[in-house]
Amino acid sequence: MAAADVRDMLDLPAEGQPRPHKKQKVVEKRPEGITRELFALLGERAPPIAINENRYKGRPKWQTKARVRPCARSDDLVLRHWQREPESTNIPAIEDTRAEGETKEQGEHKTADREYPFAKYNIKLKFSNRYTTDEYNRHLRSEDWSREETDYLMDLVEEYDLRWVVIADRYDFQPQRVDNTEETSSALVPSKQFRTMEQMKARYYFVAASMLALEHPPSEMSEAEFDLHERMMKFDPERERHRKELAALQLNRTADEVREETVLLEELKRITANEQEFVTERRELYSRLDVPISVSNATNYHNSQGLSHLLQTLLQADKSKKRRSILGPDGIAPTSGGQTPTIPNAPGSARDSSRADTPNGGTTQSTTTKKAAAAANREAAQQAIRTLTPAEEARYGVQHHDRLAPGVQFRSDRAQKLTQAKSHVQTQKLASALAELEVPLRLFMPTERVVKEFEKLIHSVNLLLDARKVAEKVESEIRVLEAAKEERERKAKELREKDKPEVKSEQQDNDVPIPPAPAPVAAGDASQTGQPAKTNEGQAELNGSSTTNNVADSEPSTQEQEGVSHKRSASVLSNGSDKSSKRQKK
């Protein structure tokens, strides 16, 4: 299909867009200083080294122009200025030098008559009209400034165009001599007085403001003139001097002082940025300090009843705080529609009572009027608003919420969240407790009353679980202490049994074989045979110690089982006494 057919089908004009132009080949200009053959050898690649010759800007050529006469001067002063020479043009040379000199002189005379180029910077300030003698005597007289010195100051100000630095530097007033009429007296020269820049400014501003007010009264002044008049009249020399001293101190600071000031400014910015956070923390701290100090004993909260009482007390305190934040400063809740809320007939505040006791009659009357107006408003509001009884609130479904969460919530979700504790173990304990009470975890009909009762039940179950946990902990501690006590008693009993003296019965004496008594030995024989006697005594001691050990190992409960007190022979008693004395020696 041809393009013309397509245009015909689409109802387009026959002539389409113009055809694009053919790209013309750009022929690069051969740089100067290189031959055509060498440039052709380079091809499309750029030369590795630039061949262009650097051409620096030449110095401007200056020439003197024709003379000019400044318009700001009254004399015939002629000045010459250096100006740049215009670009050279191909002007044919003039053969006659005289004609060239004449043309130059004519150009100089023409330029001397034309306007001076720097005349635009010659700006003269507009000063107020000079005062007359009558105006000076009535409005401008001063004890510190004379008429001649004031005239001298005004002349300097006009001459140097309010450049106060130059004026203060050139100020040199010479007071005139005072001539007396008497011939004998000589002329008196008053002392020269030094004037500061602030004093000169104050005097000039006072004269200028007074003359401006005489020419144009303040009621007829424009906004700019009135602003200027106010600034000149309110000029304070002492404040200006103090400002300059502070500026000098600021400029003469050392590097350490500048660094310290920078640190202080950064700290100030940080404190200002965190001011809101500080205010919030301070308010929270004050709210914590308002909590009353508990004087009760902590032992009251060791059982479940004390813990439940503590929880109810904290909830009640939290509700009272929220209620105080909702109510106004006078304890009145804000109402919509501009109606005044109802307040019972309460006594006046302490401030009203203190004002009523003052002897000032006007204050008492105003206080009484305020009280009467407040009472009238209360009565009107009480008539306009009707308070519902609890039965009516239950009938109409009126509810007072302490806090409402944003968004839509289902009661079933709220009841389900109550059964979920922080830990999985606590959740299982709560579920088992509800299973024992035969209460389902998910309510079938979660009405408002059912959800409230379910919340109370969950709260009681949590208290029960906490109390059970505490009880188990206490019982385990009791068992540990009892076991430790039994161990101590057992050890003490063993120690007592070891330290208890041991006594033999007659039956035990009969059971133990008595060794045969040694033969009597004469005194002479004993002296001759002293060694066998000592041997017999050692054997007796060994027998006695072995007997004692046997008695100690025997149980003392044999005498209690028999229940009969056996008689003891003299030999047994003597043996016991010998054993006890030997034990002490050991």
UniProtKB/Swiss-Prot annotation:
Residues 1-10, 486-507 have a biased composition (Basic and acidic residues). Residues 363-383 have a biased composition (Low complexity). This is SWR1-complex protein 4. It comes from the Eukaryota. It is found in: Nucleus. The keyword S-adenosyl-L-methionine does not apply. Component of the SWR1 complex which mediates the ATP-dependent exchange of histone H2A for the H2A variant HZT1 leading to transcriptional regulation of selected genes by chromatin remodeling. Component of the NuA4 histone acetyltransferase complex which is involved in transcriptional activation of selected genes principally by acetylation of nucleosomal histone H4 and H2A. The NuA4 complex is also involved in DNA repair. Residues 527-562 have a biased composition (Polar residues). Its main location: nucleus.
